[in-house]
């Protein structure tokens, strides 16, 4: 079946019971009305104003009951969904299965009514349509037949009703609702109103088959219409006992109330599985519109737990009935967080610590108004109503909360020890023993409660201590047998929140847990200035073993003999003043052999003064001259000119020898030439100190001689 855009308002036929008492679920306790409603033609407007309609009924009285937003979070919540204007067929529908509801309070003989101006309007999110089903098995077929006939009649009002047996067919009239193509916020302010048309029949509607129409207010401008007092009074009389489930089927799911009661547990399991598939998509569309639907601070705190549970599990569990009863019976606000904490252990497991901390903030109601405001804002922030899947998808919205959750989850396991008690020490010498939880399953939920009990016991000891010590003193948690100290800021002494910065300090080895002091005087080194001065003087006055006489600045030795005395070659003073004679000769010879000039040899390298030498058997000028001649001869030989001359002589002698080969005088001449060259080379070898060069020359001349 091809699904069509369902913008068609539909009439609702309800047969009321005369014995039923009218209930007002939220706001407007109402005034008495005539027994009949006068009908008014519904006109569709495309502008920003909403359409208010009235219901027409027969002479028999009927009951008009609907939920406000605070009651939606506690009981059954029928989500009205809007379809897109582009006639797409991908529209998930929510089918609401009605169950038995307990009777409300009697207002009087007159019927409670809602005037045209008192109808609360709600903005329906994008791509959603609400289908309210009643009891009967033939309604599904009529619904399909009706959608086939309504291709082009979008603005026509069609009323249909089905009368079969003990059931009464009911539907709803949905006026124009906003539709937008993108984003989570609506672009117009058009509203939708539910019109209830009742007609008298031969059968009466039993109280257990009562159809309840719910409309949700997502406009923050209508918060003032219903005070938190009226919400609390209506909440105390409300005991919802039914569940709803979300589905993607095109046709509504119709279920009998007796069947739901008999098979309540399997239905909850199946609805849980079906609801989780569509929760992510639906909640992503209404994330922005739902963010402004809190009534007041206190009413949002009361409905915070059930709202988060319903958005997470996608169905309202009968367990909420006990929470609503406990809230109605016990007016104290300090016990409401306890009920929420008990429900929190079954719902959001990752928010146990946050609810525990918010419940702690409610216990300190005796603080100033500024602190109460901080506690209310903190408890409102620490209990997010969106599911974990949406929190993971909406990174810009909830990244700060995820970081705080990770910081808190990383802090709390550090203080979770198994069997020994934690000692929390305060500056006012108060010691509170906090017993560690032994239950591994409830450790995460019990940890904030235990800390709340310990802090309340500490602050409850004396009023002056709770007022002054809780604000001005810090809590330092010292773990026995550990090397870490956890320090909490002083402002959080009496009320712990999740925004806590904990500093970790390493306790030194000399830490004494009895008095809380460390023996720094024992391990610290001595800083006595008198002792340091004595050490410095002793180092300066200490005599060296080698300081008996003057030392040579080259060999660092004293005068050993009379032949090798210490001299003063230059104007250097101190340890460089004296030099041995032998050490000075060796130093000067090394400078001469290095090829230094005479001026560089006779000049001190340190003081740049002329050396005054009177050495025996050591003439610097003669040594430098001899070395200069040797350098010249070596340069001549190294240049190759000598070899060229020698080669020329050999060629002449060889030519003469070749011309007179047979003459013996030629051989004698050649031998004499070789000897002459050998003698000349021997003279050169005597002036060379290199023995290797001598061997090479000798081998060369030997070869020439034997030739």
Swiss-Prot record:
Record-linked Gene3D superfamilies: Zinc/RING finger domain, C3HC4 (zinc finger)
Recorded metabolic or biological pathway in which this protein acts: Protein modification; protein ubiquitination
Catalytic activity: S-ubiquitinyl-[E2 ubiquitin-conjugating enzyme]-L-cysteine + [acceptor protein]-L-lysine = [E2 ubiquitin-conjugating enzyme]-L-cysteine + N(6)-ubiquitinyl-[acceptor protein]-L-lysine
Compartment annotation: Cytoplasm
Zinc finger region(s), RING-CH-type: 544-614
Modified residues (N-acetylmethionine): 1
Enzyme class (EC, first level): transferase
Highest taxon of source: Eukaryota
SUPFAM superfamilies hit by this protein: RING/U-box (SSF57850)
Protein name: E3 ubiquitin-protein ligase MARCHF7
One MF term in the entry's GO annotations: transferase activity
Record EC number: 2.3.2.27
Keyword terms, alphabetized: Acetylation, Cytoplasm, Metal-binding, Phosphoprotein, Transferase, Ubl conjugation pathway, Zinc, Zinc-finger
CDD domains cross-referenced by the UniProt entry: RING_CH-C4HC3_MARCH7
Entry binding sites for Zn(2+) 1: 552, 555, 580, 583
Protein role: E3 ubiquitin-protein ligase which may specifically enhance the E2 activity of HIP2. E3 ubiquitin ligases accept ubiquitin from an E2 ubiquitin-conjugating enzyme in the form of a thioester and then directly transfer the ubiquitin to targeted substrates. May be involved in T-cell proliferation by regulating LIF secretion. May play a role in lysosome homeostasis. Promotes 'Lys-6', 'Lys-11' and 'Lys-63'-linked mixed polyubiquitination on ATG14 leading to the inhibition of autophagy by impairing the interaction between ATG14 and STX7.
Disulfide bond residue pairs: none
Biased amino acid composition, Polar residues: 66-83, 95-126, 189-212, 254-270, 304-336, 373-392, 412-421
A single GO BP: negative regulation of intrinsic apoptotic signaling pathway in response to DNA damage by p53 class mediator
Domains: entry comment: The RING-CH-type zinc finger domain is required for E3 ligase activity.
GO cellular component term of the entry, any: cytosol
Binding site for Zn(2+) 2: 570, 572, 604, 607
Main location: cytoplasm
């Amino acid at each position: 079946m091809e699904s069509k855009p369902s913008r068609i308002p539909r009439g609702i036929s309800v047969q009321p019971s005369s014995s039923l008492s009218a209930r007002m679920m939220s706001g407007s306790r109402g005034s008495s009305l005539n027994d009949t409603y006068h009908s008014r033609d519904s006109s569709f407007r495309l502008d920003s104003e909403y359409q208010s309609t009235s219901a027409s009924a027969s002479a028999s009285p009927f009951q008009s009951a609907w939920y406000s937003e605070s009651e939606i979070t506690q009981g059954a919540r029928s989500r009205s969904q809007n379809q897109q204007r582009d006639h797409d067929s991908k529209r998930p529908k929510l089918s609401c299965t009605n169950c038995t509801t307990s009777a409300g309070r009697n207002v009087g003989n007159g019927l409670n009514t809602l005037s045209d101006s008192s109808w609360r309007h709600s903005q329906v999110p994008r791509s959603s349509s609400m289908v309210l089903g009643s009891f009967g098995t033939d309604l599904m077929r009529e619904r399909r037949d009706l959608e086939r006939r309504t291709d082009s009649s979008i603005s026509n009002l069609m009323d249909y009703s089905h009368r079969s047996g003990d059931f009464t067919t009911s539907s709803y009239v949905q006026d124009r609702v906003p539709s937008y193509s993108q984003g989570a916020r609506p672009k117009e302010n058009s509203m939708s109103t539910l019109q209830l048309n009742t007609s008298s029949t031969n059968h009466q509607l039993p109280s257990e088959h009562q159809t309840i129409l719910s409309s949700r207010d997502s406009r923050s401008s209508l918060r003032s219409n219903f005070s938190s007092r009226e919400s609390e009074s209506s909440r105390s009389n409300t005991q919802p006992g039914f569940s709803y489930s979300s589905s993607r089927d095109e046709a509504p799911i119709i279920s009998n109330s007796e069947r739901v009661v008999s098979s309540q547990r399997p239905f909850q399991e199946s609805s849980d599985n079906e609801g989780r598939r569509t929760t992510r998509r639906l909640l992503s569309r209404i994330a922005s519109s739902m963010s402004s639907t809190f009534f007041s601070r206190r009413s949002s705190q009361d409905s915070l737990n059930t709202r988060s549970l319903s958005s997470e599990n996608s169905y309202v569990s009968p367990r909420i009935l006990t929470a609503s009863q406990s809230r109605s019976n016990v007016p104290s606000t300090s016990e409401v967080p306890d009920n929420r904490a008990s429900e929190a252990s079954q719902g959001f497991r990752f928010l146990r610590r946050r609810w525990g901390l918010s419940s702690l903030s409610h216990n300190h109601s005796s603080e100033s108004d500024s602190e109460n405001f901080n506690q209310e804002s903190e408890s409102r922030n620490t209990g997010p109503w969106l599911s974990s899947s949406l929190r993971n998808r909406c990174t810009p919205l909830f990244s700060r909360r995820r970081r705080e959750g990770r910081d808190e989850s990383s802090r709390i396991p550090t203080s979770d020890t198994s069997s020994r008690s934690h000692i929390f020490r305060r500056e006012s010498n108060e010691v509170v023993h906090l017993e560690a939880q032994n239950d591994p399953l409830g450790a995460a939920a019990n940890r904030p409660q235990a800390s709340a009990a310990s802090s309340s016991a500490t602050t409850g000891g004396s009023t002056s201590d709770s007022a002054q010590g809780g604000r001005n003193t810090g809590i330092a948690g010292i773990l026995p047998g550990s090397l870490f100290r956890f320090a909490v800021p002083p402002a959080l002494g009496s009320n712990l929140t999740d925004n806590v910065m904990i500093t970790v300090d390493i306790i030194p080895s000399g830490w004494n847990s009895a008095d809380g002091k460390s023996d720094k005087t024992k391990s610290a080194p001595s800083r006595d200035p008198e002792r340091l001065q004595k050490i410095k003087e002793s180092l300066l006055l200490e005599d060296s073993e080698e300081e008996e006489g003057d030392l040579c600045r080259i060999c660092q030795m004293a005068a050993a003999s009379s032949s090798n005395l210490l001299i003063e070659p230059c104007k250097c003073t101190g340890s460089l003043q004296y030099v041995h004679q032998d050490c000075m000769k060796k130093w000067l010879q090394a400078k001469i052999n290095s090829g230094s000039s005479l001026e560089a040899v006779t000049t001190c390298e340190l003081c740049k003064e002329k050396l005054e030498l009177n050495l025996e058997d050591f003439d610097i000028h003669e040594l430098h001259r001899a070395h200069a001649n040797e350098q010249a001869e070596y340069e001549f030989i190294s240049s190759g000119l000598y070899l060229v001359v020698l080669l020329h002589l050999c060629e002449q002698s060889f030519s003469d020898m070749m011309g007179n080969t047979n003459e013996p005088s030629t051989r004698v001449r050649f031998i004499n030439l070789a000897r002459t060259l050998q003698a000349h080379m021997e003279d050169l070898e005597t002036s060379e100190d290199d023995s290797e060069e001598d061997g090479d020359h000798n081998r060369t001349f030997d070869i020439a001689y034997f030739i």
